[in-house]
Amino acid sequence: HGAGNLGRQAALLAGLPITTSGVTVNRFCSSGLQTIATAANYVRNDGADVVVAGGVESLSFPGGGGSMQNNDPKLAQQYPAIFMPMIDTADIVAERYKISREYQDEFSLESQRRMAAAQQANKFADEIVPMATKMKVVNKETKEESIVDYVVNRDECNRPDTTLEGLAKLAPVRGEGKFITAGNA
């Protein structure tokens, strides 16, 4: 999002001294997880006493991460697959390894159920730091917008009311004959 070295900015905004280093890791969907693995490596192998790790992935504002306009034309010509969107990769893998749409929907449903049960049991309470923010609320009837104070204290992207029937009704993103939908991606 044009944030430059976001890791360094976060360190400074957290009140750490200017002598504190910061590293930004971009791995799209798994950047946060990768930073934790990298931090563990610094502690285990490099003798670091303290390392802070985190991620800023956003499903509501993903940015333009993989758009072709940001890719080197020579690389795109020589190795087009490295710029392939994940949705296309997932469809190819499903077709190649004969992973049916039905199986993917069943797997997704089970994942949703497990997430709902974990949230109900507060399994992530020690791992998610509540974050105060502002949220834009749009009235669906009047379209009136307002900004409200809000605390994010849990993953809000899961759908605990998901059903197999609902998943089956979703059209594949890349069209008929493909596998990946908004519900099983």
Where is each model-derived feature located?
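N-terminal extracellular/periplasmic Venus flytrap/periplasmic-binding protein-like
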Residues: 106-185
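Active-site-proximal alpha-helical scaffold in enzymes
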Residues: 27-56, 94-123
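Short loop/turn and capping residues at structural boundaries
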Residues: 22, 54, 62, 105, ...
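A glycine/threonine-rich phosphate-anchoring loop and its flanking beta-alpha core
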Residues: 65-102
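Glycine/threonine-rich beta-strand-loop-alpha-helix active-site module
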Residues: 46-75
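Short glycine-/small-residue-rich flexible loop motifs, especially phosphate/cofactor-binding loops
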Residues: 8, 91, 116
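Conserved catalytic cysteine-centered active-site region
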Residues: 1-49, 69, 80-88, 160-185
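Short acidic, glycine/serine/threonine-rich loops at helix termini
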Residues: 3-4, 61-67, 142-143
